[in-house]
Amino acid sequence: MNKWVNTRGNQIKNNPSIQIQELKGEEIHYGRADHLLEKSDFSHQLLAVLTLSNERDKSVAIRSLDTLWSYYRYSMVSVLDWELIANTTCHPAEMVPSRLHLLWDEHAKIGEVSAVVVHPFHQNKKIGTQLFSKMHTDVALQEFDAIIGWTINPSMKHIWERHNYEKIAFPWKLYEEWLAFFEPLIGREVFEKNAHCGLFIHPKHEKAKEEKIRSALASL
């Protein structure tokens, strides 16, 4: 069971603001951490990486997107893997570096990771920097079938495009929700000018897989 805790280390399971969803029989606990928003630098991005090259049930990974994208409104996620990581926290100081390296160096390369999420406020930390520096290399980017990304930092979008990932836009309702959330924080003009969100698919993938992904996203 994944237990989300706040920066004081207290469990927030019974907090009224918690949303509980189930994924493959596991309870996933969410907790609002609005007090962290003031510390967040929204020039950085919330990034999700979804590996689709493995032989696991692709529908499980696709279904997880609905849960995955609810995190944009919570300022608390460091690293999450749906099946391999059982417990993570909202504070980077509580993350174990070796756990991140285990995810990246061993599991990602053999296609076992369903999803990796890095919150913007962690990107300035040592752990986030290590992950993002690896993602900026040709070798790292070529290991992924698709990158699901949201950013108001154009540099990340340009990096994806430079590595020939094709952008597929997310449903408009998600963009509207993001706008509603971030407008009071950074203003509508800044958001609309800089926001980029979409699924970036590498052109090496067969058409059937691409159409399946498009169809799954359209159903969200």
Q: Where in the sequence are the language-model features?
A:
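Short alpha-helical
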Residues: 28, 154-155
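Conserved short alpha-helix immediately C-terminal to the canonical SAM/SAH-binding motif I
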Residues: 131, 155-156
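Conserved acetyl-CoA-binding loop of GNAT-fold acetyltransferases
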Residues: 161-171
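C-terminal "cap" of GNAT-fold acetyltransferases
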Residues: 174-220
